[in-house]
Amino acid sequence: MHFTATVLLAFGMSMDAFAASIGKGATLHKPKFSEALRTGLIFGAVETLTPLIGWGLGILASKFVLEWNHWIAFVLLIFLGGRMIIEGIRGGSDEDETPLRRHSFWLLVTTAIATSLDAMAVGVGLAFLQVNIIATALAIGCATLIMSTLGMMIGRFIGPMLGKRAEILGGVVLIGIGVQILWTHFHG
């Protein structure tokens, strides 16, 4: 695959994580750059691994993976988005939330997995092309690191303007990503 195509693929694959990061940044009470970088690193690491996993699965069982990846992503994103909406409606004070609760590792990993299943599907497709899968996966991971960190920082500035609605908006964004994944699968 040509360098330009790899870069375009990498940034294209990072867009779901970018959108989710904006939502996450908006829901946190004044996230610091270190939190944004942590989010970017987690999203980037997961987004690096998923095309590699997809590539391996593509060699073994591409039909099953392609038939189910959109449903898995949809269910995960609907669950996470619904949870964020419910928490946003219930309210509560941002100051009462501990940093671990607000930005837990496992919540970030789950969100990262949900937004990177399309990268796994791309990895399946790459199994049938002449590509350097390691270089391509690293490019996708680096682009996701950059875009997710940037998304968190953008969300940081949007969040105070939205107040409690930020968590609801973040949930709607995740649900929207899930619906978009399902829509794209059924409507090309």
From Swiss-Prot:
GO terms for biological process: intracellular manganese ion homeostasis; manganese ion export across plasma membrane. The chain crosses the membrane at residues 3-23, 41-61, 66-86, 106-128, 143-163, 168-188. It is found in: Cell inner membrane. GO terms for molecular function: manganese ion transmembrane transporter activity. GO terms for cellular component: plasma membrane. The keyword Lipid metabolism does not apply. NCBIfam families: PRK11469.1. This is Probable manganese efflux pump MntP. It is a multi-pass membrane protein. Belongs to the MntP (TC 9.B.29) family. Probably functions as a manganese efflux pump. The keyword Ribonucleoprotein does not apply. Keywords: Cell inner membrane, Cell membrane, Ion transport, Manganese, Membrane, Transmembrane, Transmembrane helix, Transport. It comes from Salmonella typhimurium (strain LT2 / SGSC1412 / ATCC 700720).
